[in-house]
Amino acid sequence: MSGFLDDYSESLEQFESFRADDQDVHQHITSGEHDPVDGDSNVADAEQDDLLGLDTQIKLTKRKPTARVDNNRIFSQKGLGYLLKNHHKLSKTIQRNDKQFEEKSKNGRVHRAQKFQHEYDNLSSVLQFYQLWCHGMFPKANFKDCVHLLRLLGAKSPRLRLYRRELIEQEIIKLKEASGIIVEQEERENTLQAGNIIVDAENQETEDIIEASNINNVVSTETSGETNGLFVGDNDDDDLYHTPPPPETVSPNIAVSSIVVSKPDLADITGVSDTDTTIVDKSEVNIQPIAIPVLTQVSDLTNTTNNESDHDAFSDDDDFYASLNETFVHQERPPQESDYDAEEEVMKEMGL
């Protein structure tokens, strides 16, 4: 009986242990963990599947930033700010050394070695000042490397070149103001303001003149309605090919016929007709010369032609009448017959 109980207790213990193992396996499956029985095989399968290393985790370490001389470092308080703040100390040191050297030179003759020593002291002060500055700005580099890095930055950085140019221009302006070449800033601003006021006044006067001229042009075009004759008018109804009528001129034939001089009739001269057979005494015959109005008619003709040609600037009649005037002016009068010839003609006609 005792043996049976022992066997029953052992089997019960085995069942409980199996049940506990089953619960553990169930927990592993639900939690996503690998089965402890098949752990080695699962790891081997995972290594074969992850040949490219996509699922492996890599630990990344952050690199320390490399110290270098850049714009941020050079424009910081330890950079150019330190030089602008403390450069007057270096100037005072050099002035003090110069003053001591002048006092020594007044007492007696200065040797050449003393001059070199004075210059060496000044250069040593400058070198120590810049060594201290470089060490505070870039501690990891010695002075020689720091100078090399600063030269490279000055050649590459546009911001640093512009800043250096501004400093140089400011110093030049200060020297010019001290020497009286240029006026100070306040006087310069006042001069510029006065100049701007004058320029504005001149511009305003010019604008007023232009506006007045434009108004006059508008009024003149509205009243006239036409252009000045040099260009085609704005009116579309104008005839582009319209020509002015020709001026009234005197016909050349009429002018010539009006000034032709006819031979004087004997009856007009003697006062005796052809039918009168009365003997006329020579003493009773009174021959009066007839005035030939050649010049008067020609002058009247030229005056009329000139007055008519004045209306036409491109008239061709001027040449014709000028030549005609010259012809009749220079025409010689026919020689008058003497009294003796006239008497002979009268006697012949009477049959004597």
From Swiss-Prot:
It is found in: Nucleus. It comes from the Eukaryota. The keyword DNA repair applies. Residues 16-37 have a biased composition (Basic and acidic residues). Residues 16-44, 330-352 are annotated as: Disordered. GO terms for molecular function: DNA binding. GO terms for biological process: DNA repair; DNA replication checkpoint signaling; meiotic cell cycle; replication fork arrest; replication fork processing. One of its GO terms (cellular component) is replication fork protection complex. Its main location: nucleus. Keywords: Cell cycle, DNA damage, DNA repair, DNA replication inhibitor, Meiosis, Nucleus. Forms a fork protection complex (FPC) with TOF1 and which is required for chromosome segregation during meiosis and DNA damage repair. FPC coordinates leading and lagging strand synthesis and moves with the replication fork. FPC stabilizes replication forks in a configuration that is recognized by replication checkpoint sensors. Component of the fork protection complex (FPC) consisting of TOF1 and CSM3. Belongs to the CSM3 family. This is Chromosome segregation in meiosis protein 3.
